[in-house]
UniProtKB/Swiss-Prot annotation:
Keywords: ANK repeat, Cell cycle, Cytoplasm, Endoplasmic reticulum, Golgi apparatus, Membrane, Repeat, Transcription, Transcription regulation, Transferase, Ubl conjugation, Ubl conjugation pathway. Homodimer. The homodimer is autoinhibited and stabilized by its N-terminal helix. Interacts with RAB1 (RAB1A, RAB1B or RAB1C), RAB4 (RAB4A or RAB4B) and RAB11 (RAB11A or RAB11B); in a GTP-dependent manner. Interacts with the 26S proteasomal complex through the 20S core proteasomal subunit. Interacts with RARB. The gene is Hace1. Its EC number is 2.3.2.26. Residues 398-433 are annotated as: Disordered. GO terms for biological process: Golgi organization; membrane fusion; protein K48-linked ubiquitination; protein ubiquitination; regulation of cell migration; ubiquitin-dependent protein catabolic process. It comes from Mus musculus. It catalyses: S-ubiquitinyl-[E2 ubiquitin-conjugating enzyme]-L-cysteine + [acceptor protein]-L-lysine = [E2 ubiquitin-conjugating enzyme]-L-cysteine + N(6)-ubiquitinyl-[acceptor protein]-L-lysine. Pathway: Protein modification; protein ubiquitination. This is E3 ubiquitin-protein ligase HACE1.
Amino acid sequence: MERAMEQLNRLTRSLRRARTVELPEDNETAVYTLMPMVMADQHRSVSELLSNSKFDVNYAFGRVKRSLLHIAANCGSVECLVLLLKKGANPNYQDISGCTPLHLAARNGQKKCMSKLLEYSADVNICNNEGLTAIHWLAVNGRTELLHDLVQHVTDVDVEDAMGQTALHVACQNGHKTTVQCLLDSGADINRPNVSGATPLYFACSHGQRDTAQILLLRGAKYLPDKNGVTPLDLCVQGGYGQTCEVLIQYHPRLFQTIVQMTQNEDLRENMLRQVLQHLSQQSESQYLKILTGLAEVATTNGHKLLSLSSNYDAQMKSLLRIVRIFCHVFRIGPSSPSNGIDMGYNGNKTPRSQVFKPLELLWHSLDEWLVLIATELMKNKEDSTDITSILLKQKGQDQEAPSLSAFEPPGPGSYESLPPGPGDSKPEVLAGEQEASADCQDVISVTANRLSAVIQAFYMCCSCQMPPGMTSPRFIEFVCKHDEVLKCFVNRNPKIIFDHFHFLLECPELMSRFMHIIKAQPFKDRCEWFYEHLHSGQPDSDMVHRPVSENDILLVHRDSIFRSSCEIVSKANCAKLKQGIAVRFHGEEGMGQGVVREWFDILSNEIVNPDYALFTQSADGTTFQPNSNSYVNPDHLNYFRFAGQILGLALNHRQLVNIYFTRSFYKHILGIPVNYQDVASIDPEYAKNLQWILDNDISDLGLELTFSVETDVFGAMEEVPLKPGGGSILVTQNNKAEYVQLVTELRMTRAIQPQINAFLQGFHMFIPPSLIQLFDEYELELLLSGMPEIDVNDWIKNTEYTSGYEREDPVIQWFWEVVEDITQEERVLLLQFVTGSSRVPHGGFANIMGGSGLQNFTIAAVPYTPNLLPTSSTCINMLKLPEYPSKEILKDRLLVALHCGSYGYTMA
């Protein structure tokens, strides 16, 4: 009966308290009953359960083998912690990682728990498996108020963890100022190294902790490297911690020059160096000038090393350009930079800031001497039998004949002894062995071109940073004009110099024209790489489309009105952000990513030429489009043309192909290339033939009575439009007929659609600078925008006709098709463009190629062979005029020259 009553009482108490009133007999089950109560600090319930139980309060459970005392200390359950201690819980019991309850209380800042644990003799000197003590945990988290209490119980404040780090190390690393001061006041060793030799100052600098570094230095911390020779300054510069560098320099002024010299270290990230020097330069005017002067001196030294042929070209070139970039960056951020209009000295005024360039004048003088020397040797009389290379060989004491300079043949005797010396009387050197500049096999142009071009690039950068944005330095323009012939020799010998060092051409239209013919002769692939390198040069991520886009910058468009909604949202969007990254989402759809972006561009490229918008009309070939001169029927036509330009510019910027092809004349308008009468064939083939006829025949006695005016339909009424002022009274003659043809071409192809062209270019140039796009011709621009089409050679052969003596079985024809099969896909496209004016094969294959008067098969006509004669074409009738070459090798060579070097001998036969 008593037992039943006892069970009933237990049941009643359990129901009233909504918990068990007795612990299970086994510890494993009991501990999980107690744990939530301990975490909630329900000490009365815990006490009641423990009072009638044999539970072991030191029982370790779980994966990490902790006791309930660990749980109480970790959660700050101070009442339960005291209860457990009174019940005999071991305050120094370590879990599987070696942590005691005191460690956990210290890590989480449980002050009351720490105090009670210390009362019950918790050992503050116990280390966990990593060697960390409670004092380390307090230092890591900056628990200074607890540290004051704990250090009184610590026997060694410099106790080390497994890596030899003390509490002072970790406090300095985490920037806890008051903790650092407390540890130092408690006797911590300020210069104690860890196992790798790193001191507390080293740790503070590794994370840019300026304030803790200043406390250490103020208290006499030594500036010491680690065992690998890495110094605190190295760490500051690596992390870009300008403020911490400033503190180090305050206590160790000699480090200022060290930072300047660090610009030569290619292992240091350039942006971090810029960050540090930018901060230091903004502290005072004198320090700003001191930094710039130091950088100029280092650049000059590196430049002269680069001009020495015994140096490593690649390393010295990178070092010089890196230093000059940093120099220009620091110079621009000063209060008298070009951007804020304060005089920088480019008008001839010598200001303190412009004087920082003075050390560089030595380098520019040496550069000028080199170029003058080379120009002098190139101009010497051909009777002289000794070229520059021979002179270099004589300096080496060699008597063998030097190789000739085949590209220039610049003979001329003499010796460098008779030439004006450069700075420091240094003279060009040539070393034997495996030196880059071995005169045994290379002439002086080959040896020096890259080196001098790199210095020219540095010179341009320094000239530019002294000018307001958008202006080219008159001094640099004068320099290029002075040395024009030598620079062209460099480029002719090694065209890659343009892409490596002559970046100034893209920013100086007045200089670009001097080299454009050389640039356009370079491989299309190389120019594409140069184009995108400079297009994205000022942007944070070169992989533009894949750059993350914030939710606010997503283009949310409606699929059922994609053209109008896209036009509206793109017109309002931030152009800079669109250049950096683009993301599209269709309204009501969840999909995003590159697939959606590609779909968006693809749909828009079709919508742009949708007849409903009246923006473009289909040309005579049935596959290309031309701006519609009557687009004004759409009131928003100019806004839409601007949007079309934005879409094509965006697509090119993000390397997205568009499914749209324009007439050759429109590509010319985009590139700023003048149209010619052959372009008229795209919109009016018969009229183009008439213009060709005028040019090909003597019109003196034909009585055409043409004047420099034409009749045109203006809003339904015929009006006479003069081609030039007073054109209605100027007769077209044999002497001025070429001018007439050009002016009437411009009227049909340009003036009639000038507002549309201007609106389109306004949008296009928001994303693609005119200076960059001019790297390409109209054929290449089509490939950039619309990609490389696939060409079926068998279909091409099947649908080709032969005339003027050629037949399918002729050897020349067989050689031709063998060459077509051998060349690259890109070269096949160039051939197709060369003959038909288009890079595309229409739907249905070569059987559907259009000519000026309808369907016109690809045709090959025989031309009598003369040495060096190139193939020509008549695009209006898709005819290739192929000379009767004597061999396949000559045929291939001449054909590729015509394709790559622009032998576009178009006629309207």
